[in-house]
Every structure is written in C-alpha cells, then in structure tokens.
Amino acid sequence: MPLGLKPTCSMCKTNTSSMWKKGSQGEILCNNCSGKSSTAAGGNNNNNSSSSTSGSSSYTGTTFASTSTSQQSNGGNTKQSKQEIHRRSARLRNTKYKATPAAEKKVSTKGKGRRHIFKLKNGLYYQIGDVVSVVDEEDGKTYYAQVRGFIQDQYCEKSAALTWLIPTLSSPKDGFDPSTYIIGPDEDLPRKMECLEFVCHAPSEYFKSRSSPFPTIPTRPEKGFIWTHIGPTPAISIKETMANH
C-alpha cells in the first residue's frame, strides 16, 4: 500500500482499526472483520469433518477388525524387538566386564638409568663431572669447564650445562692440571656437545671440596695419615716443617 493512504476494510468499509490484516484472496480486513472471517472458515471445516466421519462410518466391521489385528501384531513385534535389543546389550555389557585385563609390561630400569647418567657422543660416554675444553672463536684460546648436567631436545640434539673452571698462576699453559684450577661461575645456557672436547673424567664434587687440594701445614699433630703431593710441583716436606716447630 502506498505511503500516506488510509486503508479501507473491504467488508465494513471502515477507515479506523487497531490492526489491519489481509484475507485469503488478498483483500484488506479490519480487526473485527478478520475475526469474523476466521470463525466462518472454522465452521466450514467442522462441517467437512463431520461429513467425512459419517462417510467413514459406512465401512464394514471386517475392515476395523483387520486393522486392529494388524496393530496388535505390530505391537507384539515391537515388544519382541525391544527384548532382543535389551538381551543383546546385556550380552555386550557382560562380555565387556568379563574381558581379561591386558598384561602389564615390565619396565627394565637397567639401561634407562645409564642413559640418564651417560651421554654417548663421538664414540665416547660423557658423564656428569667430566672436564671438557672449549675453544674461543675470537682469540683462539682454550677454556676449561666441568659438565654440570645433560639436556636432550625433541630432535635428539644433545647439550651440556657447564661450570667454568678458573686457572691460577700455577696452571700450565699447554695442558690441563685439575689441581691448579678453581671452580668458577655456572653458565646459564647449555652448549651443544659438538662444541665440546673431552679432557678427562673427574668427580662432580672435586672442585667443590672444602679441603684444599694443595698440601697445607696442619695446626695440630695428626697421626695415621700418609702425606703425598697433589699439585704439579713437589710438595713441601711436612716432616721438616713439623720438626722445626
């Protein structure tokens, strides 16, 4: 309907209504006339339904009997099918619970511990506490460190966490003497095993020992000990120093 034109009911010709509706043939109806048309349509439907019921009552009794018997037979079949489904589900449930549990696999820890403690690289087993050398690319000098732990990523690349060893004045320039080195700082980032070169095996607590690796003069006489030197130079004769005191 164009904008600005007032609608007009096709039945009562009124121009005012709270609600406008369209009929089955597209005519415009007001709210009162649309209710009257719906009640009239309902009455026609009731008449049609009554006529259909009266026509259906002319059927013979044999037809109703046949339909009732077929419904009863269908009901019996559905009950039997439900019982069969219930029995099948019960069988499945029983067999599921009666299934034997899978045999547990025995985990052997003989080789697992060795893999955690040792790392094979270039045909050599590395372990925690080993002393390795690292060559600096800038100055070409060799630095020594002690292995603190091992790391292996998802691509099987092996790395090692290092603790640097600081040389002293008595440390040799061409080789490595563990008794002349002291423990240094721990490195935060691990280094790949390809950058490391094996030097020697050593206990993990060797450089953290509270007692000095160098021979010291005891403050009180001690018996039952055998004195020997640890450093690269001959030790001081302890017996002579004790005799002088």
Curated annotation (Swiss-Prot):
Keywords: Metal-binding, Nucleus, Zinc, Zinc-finger. InterPro entries: GATAD1, Znf_GATA, Znf_NHR/GATA. Its main location: nucleus. GO terms for biological process: chromatin organization; regulation of DNA-templated transcription. It is found in: Nucleus. The keyword Nucleotidyltransferase does not apply. Residues 71-80 have a biased composition (Polar residues). It comes from the Eukaryota. Component of some chromatin complex recruited to chromatin sites methylated 'Lys-4' of histone H3 (H3K4me), with a preference for trimethylated form (H3K4me3). The keyword Nucleus applies. Signal peptide: none annotated. GO terms for molecular function: sequence-specific DNA binding; zinc ion binding. It comes from Xenopus laevis. This is GATA zinc finger domain-containing protein 1.
